[in-house]
Amino acid sequence: MTKRSEAKYKIDRRMGQNIWGRPKSPVNRREYGPGQHGQRRKGKLSDFGVQLRAKQKLKGYYANISERQFHSIYVEATRLKGDSGENLIGLLERRLDTVVYRAKFVSTMFAARQFINHGHIKVNGKRVNISSYKVRVGDLIEVKESSKQLAFVLEASQLAERDVPDYIEVDHNKMTAKFGRIPALTDVPFAVQMEPHLIVEFYSR
């Protein structure tokens, strides 16, 4: 198992949930956290603990976004019209690494970030190597021509464990994806329940 896989599955073990719905997640075999003391029964969480856990789970899902970056996204969400929790999800789904993952150009969020950083992705015909780049409605995301035949890209497009959400239009023959609209929480294909309202409560303390 690679270091990236270990880090990814460590998040699953810490949360006690298979947050990406991956068949190989260790929590499919056990329901306790990592380490030798992982099997100890956990006490009931305080309200703060529940809110913190919700934040950690959402941060972890999006490939362990740093606290500084996550809080910056939250602040932006509060400045937009509408529900701050819904806005938070919408902003996270507009990240380029999220769209690349959703389009099934790669198999994991972590791989999406690396794929972009290495210059394999174009947005509206121009190469973008910043994984946090904010995609706009109507943007066309595509895999660079020389990268389309990479084995892991071809394998990812065939993954049956997840579908492309309807707010992204994908042409797997051309390896392109059009960002159709900003999704609501209920549109996003999370494998586990996400509770952005608890994150709003956490930062509002």
From Swiss-Prot:
<dbReference type="GO" id="GO:0042274">
    <property type="term" value="P:ribosomal small subunit biogenesis"/>
</dbReference>
<dbReference type="InterPro" id="IPR002942">
    <property type="entry name" value="S4_RNA-bd"/>
</dbReference>
<keyword id="KW-0699">rRNA-binding</keyword>
<dbReference type="InterPro" id="IPR022801">
    <property type="entry name" value="Ribosomal_uS4"/>
</dbReference>
<comment type="function">
    <text>One of the primary rRNA binding proteins, it binds directly to 16S rRNA where it nucleates assembly of the body of the 30S subunit.</text>
</comment>
<dbReference type="InterPro" id="IPR018079">
    <property type="entry name" value="Ribosomal_uS4_CS"/>
</dbReference>
<comment type="subunit">
    <text>Part of the 30S ribosomal subunit. Contacts protein S5. The interaction surface between S4 and S5 is involved in control of translational fidelity.</text>
</comment>
<feature type="region of interest" description="Disordered">
    <location>
        <begin position="18"/>
        <end position="46"/>
    </location>
</feature>
<keyword id="KW-0694">RNA-binding</keyword>
<dbReference type="GO" id="GO:0015935">
    <property type="term" value="C:small ribosomal subunit"/>
</dbReference>
<dbReference type="Pfam" id="PF01479">
    <property type="entry name" value="S4"/>
</dbReference>
<comment type="function">
    <text>With S5 and S12 plays an important role in translational accuracy.</text>
</comment>
<dbReference type="InterPro" id="IPR001912">
    <property type="entry name" value="Ribosomal_uS4_N"/>
</dbReference>
<protein>
    <recommendedName>
        <fullName>Small ribosomal subunit protein uS4</fullName>
    </recommendedName>
</protein>
<comment type="similarity">
    <text>Belongs to the universal ribosomal protein uS4 family.</text>
</comment>
<feature type="domain" description="S4 RNA-binding">
    <location>
        <begin position="94"/>
        <end position="157"/>
    </location>
</feature>
<keyword id="KW-0687">Ribonucleoprotein</keyword>
<dbReference type="GO" id="GO:0003735">
    <property type="term" value="F:structural constituent of ribosome"/>
</dbReference>
<dbReference type="GO" id="GO:0006412">
    <property type="term" value="P:translation"/>
</dbReference>
<keyword id="KW-0689">Ribosomal protein</keyword>
<dbReference type="Pfam" id="PF00163">
    <property type="entry name" value="Ribosomal_S4"/>
</dbReference>
<dbReference type="GO" id="GO:0019843">
    <property type="term" value="F:rRNA binding"/>
</dbReference>
<dbReference type="InterPro" id="IPR036986">
    <property type="entry name" value="S4_RNA-bd_sf"/>
</dbReference>
<dbReference type="InterPro" id="IPR005709">
    <property type="entry name" value="Ribosomal_uS4_bac-type"/>
</dbReference>
